[in-house]
């Protein structure tokens, strides 16, 4: 009798999966015929930002920035395109004209070259490192393609960052400024596979030497029942006792809910309210309960920001919960988010020709991986708050801007490295 019930349940699940797959395929076919434009006019962009403010202050775009490739969305390819099918994309250096890209200029099997020419990066749907590795080895990308870049108004103050590292990593990013960073994963020692060390460097953009400034290091703690990453400004001492210890990332048992804390103490272990740890951000990954594979869906919750002005920078609001119901995760679950900022990942678009989900990373990400993502505000989807993705087996790029801090962005990146049992 139990075998009959099990067989019936399995058949029912398969039938539900088939119905949902058919619905998803039908939606993709209905939306596959249109090719979205790549840029909007300055006036339209300004009007949209006024109608849908994402943050307390205006979004950091200059008038020249509206023709930049920050406003270059994905170009979905129609299913089974004709041989002379063309895609239109707009170059930031020539805002008044369009450049045509001929899909059939490349060999039929060279999908990576086609995607590269329109700055699209495929997203694989497995959290397995071997799957990621197979993905980019089977579809190599070409280094000779001139990559698109996200433009920004001003460069970071590199001297200030070098002289005030501990302060810089904790404060919100300067407005109108983009911080281009790289993450290197270093595997060494007996436990190199389980406990690698991650190093975050800021890329200096005002020099031809491609110099880098060390910002943070992170490592997963041993003998911890759940994911527990320590973040430090001292790469030689990744411990809670080290002077550089500034934050930690903690997850639930499934690896679907993460909280980023500062270096304060658990409220259950201290009587000093000023030493209680702050919650810097929380990250939620949506679970795939029926076993369907697809792009990860992320939600990022963070405390509000007190906007800055000419005399003072923006300041993150302090969020020190003592009770569980006041945590970022619980406030988001109950819908009490008026004083918080809630961000989401930008949904990849399905590409019928490559049979994969793709995102436009503006040339900063070159390898397919389930870890690749872009964080946006729902009301301003073209304002990329953060993007993260793979460029080689152990190298990744991480770009962030206001209102995130370096610690928040690096902590969010750490959540992507951790395996998620219920998300695949």
Swiss-Prot record:
One of its GO terms (cellular component) is periciliary membrane compartment. GO terms for biological process: chemotaxis; lipid metabolic process; positive regulation of neurogenesis; protein localization to cilium; receptor localization to non-motile cilium. The keyword Lipid metabolism applies. Keywords: Cell projection, Chemotaxis, Cytoplasm, Lipid metabolism, Sensory transduction. Interacts with rgb-3. Has a role in fat regulation independent of daf-16. Implicated in ciliar sensory function which is required for normal sensory behavior such as chemotaxis. Functions in life span control via the insulin/IGF-1 pathway. Thought to be involved in neuronal trafficking. Belongs to the TUB family. This is Tubby protein homolog 1. It comes from Caenorhabditis briggsae.
């Amino acid at each position: 009798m139990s075998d009959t019930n099990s067989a019936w349940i399995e058949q029912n699940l398969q039938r539900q999966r088939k119905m949902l797959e058919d619905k998803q395929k039908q939606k993709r076919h209905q939306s596959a015929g249109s090719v979205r434009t790549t840029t909007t006019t300055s006036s339209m962009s300004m009007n949209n930002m006024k109608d849908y403010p994402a943050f307390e202050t205006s979004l950091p775009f200059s008038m020249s920035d509206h023709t930049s490739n920050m406003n270059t969305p994905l170009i979905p390819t129609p299913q089974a395109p004709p041989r002379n099918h063309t895609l239109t994309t707009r170059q930031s250096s020539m805002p008044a004209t369009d450049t045509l890209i001929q899909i059939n200029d490349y060999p039929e099997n060279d999908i990576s070259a086609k995607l590269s020419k329109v700055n699209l990066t495929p997203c694989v749907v497995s959290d397995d490192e071997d799957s990621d590795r197979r993905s980019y080895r089977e579809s190599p990308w070409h280094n000779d393609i001139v990559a698109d870049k996200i433009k920004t108004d001003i460069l970071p103050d590199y001297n200030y960052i070098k002289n005030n590292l501990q302060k810089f990593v904790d404060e919100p990013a300067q407005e109108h400024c983009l911080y281009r960073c790289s993450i290197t994963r270093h595997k060494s020692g007996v436990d190199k596979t389980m406990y690698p060390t991650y190093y975050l460097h800021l890329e200096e953009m005002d020099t031809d030497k491609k110099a880098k400034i060390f910002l943070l290091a992170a490592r997963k703690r041993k003998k911890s029942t759940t994911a527990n990453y320590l973040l430090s400004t001292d790469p030689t001492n990744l411990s809670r006792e080290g002077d550089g210890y500034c934050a930690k990332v903690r997850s639930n048992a499934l690896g679907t809910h993460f909280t980023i804390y500062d270096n304060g103490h658990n409220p259950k272990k201290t009587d000093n309210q000023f030493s209680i740890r702050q919650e810097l951000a929380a990250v939620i990954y949506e679970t795939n309960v029926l076993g369907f594979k697809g792009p990860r869906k992320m939600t990022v919750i963070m405390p509000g920001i007190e906007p800055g002005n000419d005399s003072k920078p923006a300041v993150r609001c302090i969020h020190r919960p003592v009770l569980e119901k006041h945590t970022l995760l619980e406030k988001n679950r109950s819908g009490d988010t008026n004083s918080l900022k809630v961000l989401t990942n930008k949904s990849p678009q399905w590409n019928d020709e490559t049979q994969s989900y793709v995102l436009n990373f503006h040339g900063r990400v070159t390898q397919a991986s389930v870890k690749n993502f872009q964080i946006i505000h729902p009301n301003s989807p073209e304002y990329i708050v953060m993007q993260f993705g793979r460029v080689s087996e152990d190298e990744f790029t991480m770009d962030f801007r206001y209102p995130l801090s370096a610690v928040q962005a690096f902590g969010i990146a750490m959540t992507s490295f951790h395996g998620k049992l219920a998300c695949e």
